[in-house]
C-alpha cells in the first residue's frame, strides 16, 4: 500500500530525514511516535505528497508518485489520500455536510452523489442529525469527526493523520481513536497516525518509533 525507499529531506543544513525505508500494508492502522524534532510530521507530509523528498522513492497504492508533476500530484492526492490534522480546519460559513462534500466537488463528483456519499459517512459517525449545523454549532469532538468524514469522502486508500486527537478531551479522544478502527473495518482504509498519545499508539496494529530522522 505504502512503500518508501531511501527517503531523505533537509532544510538548509539540517537533515530531517536520513534514508527512511518503510512498508505499510493495506488495512493497517499504524502510529508514528517519537520526540519533537524527530521528523514525524515531515515524513507524513512526504508520504502524503504535500512535500517532496530530496532523494528516494514513494509508491502509494501501486503508483510511483516520486516523479509526478504538481498537477498530477494534486489530482492523485485528492483521490487517493485523506488528511486529518489536529485542528479541524472546517470552513465556518458551510454546514457540516457541505464541509464534508468539498473534496468531492474538487474531484468533479456530481452534487447529488457527493451529498448522498457525505450523508452516508456522517450517518455512520452518528452525525446525521448534525449535518445542517455549521462548525460554531458543533462540539470539539463533532468538528473533528466531520473533519474525518471529509477525509473519507473520496474513498481514499490512505488516511494520514497528524496529532488528530491533540486538541480533544479524554472522552472525545477515546471516541475518535475507536472511530479509526471502526472505519478501517468498515471501509478498509489504511491509517497512518503521527501521535504523542501513548494510549492510541498502544492500540494501533504497529508502532513506528522515530529518533533524529531515523526509524529505530
Swiss-Prot record:
Its EC number is 7.6.2.-. SMART domains: AAA. It is a peripheral membrane protein. It comes from the Bacteria. Keywords: ATP-binding, Cell inner membrane, Cell membrane, Membrane, Nucleotide-binding, Translocase, Transport. It is found in: Cell inner membrane. Residues 2-216 form the ABC transporter domain. Coiled coil: none annotated. The complex is composed of two ATP-binding proteins (LolD) and two transmembrane proteins (LolC and LolE). Belongs to the ABC transporter superfamily. Lipoprotein translocase (TC 3.A.1.125) family. This is Lipoprotein-releasing system ATP-binding protein LolD. It comes from Bacteroides fragilis (strain ATCC 25285 / DSM 2151 / CCUG 4856 / JCM 11019 / LMG 10263 / NCTC 9343 / Onslow / VPI 2553 / EN-2).
Amino acid at each position: 500500500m505504502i512503500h518508501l525507499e531511501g527517503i531523505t529531506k533537509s532544510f538548509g543544513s539540517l537533515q530531517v530525514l536520513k534514508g527512511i525505508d518503510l512498508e505499510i500494508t493495506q488495512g493497517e492502522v499504524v502510529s508514528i511516535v517519537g520526540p519533537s524534532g524527530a521528523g514525524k510530521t515531515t515524513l507524513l507530509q512526504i508520504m502524503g505528497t504535500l512535500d517532496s523528498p530530496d532523494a528516494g522513492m514513494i509508491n502509494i497504492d501501486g503508483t510511483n508518485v516520486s516523479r509526478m508533476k504538481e498537477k498530477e500530484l494534486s489530482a492523485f492526492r485528492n483521490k487517493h489520500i485523506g488528511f486529518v490534522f489536529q485542528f479541524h480546519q472546517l470552513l465556518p460559513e458551510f454546514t457540516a455536510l457541505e464541509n464534508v462534500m468539498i473534496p468531492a466537488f474538487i474531484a468533479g463528483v456530481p452534487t447529488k452523489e457527493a451529498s448522498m456519499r457525505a450523508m452516508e459517512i456522517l450517518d455512520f459517525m452518528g452525525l446525521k442529525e448534525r449535518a445542517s449545523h455549521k462548525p460554531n454549532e458543533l462540539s470539539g469532538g463533532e468538528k473533528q469527526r466531520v473533519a474525518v468524514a471529509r477525509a473519507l469522502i473520496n474513498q481514499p486508500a490512505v488516511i494520514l493523520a497528524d496529532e488528530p486527537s491533540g486538541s480533544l478531551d479524554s472522552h472525545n479522544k477515546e471516541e475518535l481513536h475507536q472511530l479509526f478502527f471502526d472505519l478501517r473495518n468498515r471501509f478498509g482504509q489504511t491509517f497512518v497516525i503521527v501521535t504523542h498519545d501513548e494510549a492510541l499508539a498502544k492500540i494501533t496494529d504497529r508502532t513506528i518509533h522515530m529518533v533524529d530522522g531515523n526509524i529505530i
